[in-house]
Every structure is written in C-alpha cells, then in structure tokens.
Regions:
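Conserved Ser/Thr-centered positions that define the repeating blades of beta-propeller domains
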Residues: 24-25, 64-65, 104-105
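Residue-level marker for isolated small/hydroxyl-bearing positions within beta-strands
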Residues: 14-16, 56, 96
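Loop/turn residues immediately N-terminal
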Residues: 18-21, 59-62, 99-102
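Hydrophobic beta-strand positions that form the internal "hydrophobic ladder"
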Residues: 11-13, 53, 93
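Surface loop/turn motifs at the tips and blade-to-blade linkers of beta-strand repeat domains
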Residues: 35-39, 75-78
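Short coil turn/linker residues within repeat-based beta-strand modules
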Residues: 28-29, 68-69, 108-109
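Repeated scaffold domains used in trafficking and secretory/extracellular systems
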Residues: 1-8, 40-49, 80-90
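An edge-strand/N-cap motif at the start of beta-rich repeat modules
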Residues: 1-34, 112
C-alpha cells in the first residue's frame, strides 16, 4: 500500500512500483527519488516520529534521520509477528501486528503485547 507523509517542508512517499522513497517540495506536483536501495526490504508504511522517519518494511522496523535518504534497522526480529501499521501514541510507539496490538517505549527497538 502506498504511503505518504508530511515531514518538515516536504512530502515523502513510498513509490510501490519501484520500492523507492520519493520526495516533493512543491505540494506533489513533481517527485524526486531520495532512496532506491532495497537492502531495507520492501517499504510498506511510513511514520514521522520526532526527528526520525520510521518505516515498516518486509524486513522489520527501519528508521531514517536524513528524510529517508538512508535507512537503519531498529527491529528485525520479534515475537510480535508481522508489523502492519505504526502510530505515534505520545510516550509510546504503537504497532498493529499479525498478533495484536503492541507498544514500544524505546522508539521501536523492543515490543510488548498490549492486553
């Protein structure tokens, strides 16, 4: 599913046809590729989170500190199941997974089941 977010003065999106991260500085009238690397897996969802962008990929949770130009793994092995969506819950990061609702208090490094 394509995902688009606003981050600073830019719009940032996943181009699912190419699995690229793209950005626009003119309200989406034109798009430029920012990241075309596939080492992070297939991008599925984006979330602005403080000064980072978090991404759900086919390999887990990844983060970027340079507007999506490069990605680092934050959580690639978890008993939480497959990540489906992320939400900024204020003091916690929330994730809907294939096994239910999970929360993290360390930017997605570890996950705990919410009952």
């Amino acid at each position: 599913m394509p995902q688009m977010i606003s981050f600073g003065s830019e719009m940032i999106r996943i181009n699912p046809a190419k699995n690229h991260i793209e950005f626009s500085t003119n309200s989406g009238r034109s798009w430029n590729t920012r990241c075309s690397s596939t080492s992070s897996g297939t991008f599925m969802d984006l979330l602005p989170y403080g000064n980072e962008i978090l991404a759900i990929t086919s390999k887990g949770i990844y983060y970027s500190t340079n507007k999506g130009g490069s990605w680092n793994n934050r959580c690639t092995s978890t008993s939480a199941g497959t990540f489906l969506s992320l939400m900024d819950g204020g003091k916690e990061l929330l994730a809907q997974t294939s096994k239910g609702l999970y929360y993290s208090t360390n930017k997605g490094g570890s996950w705990y089941k919410r009952n």
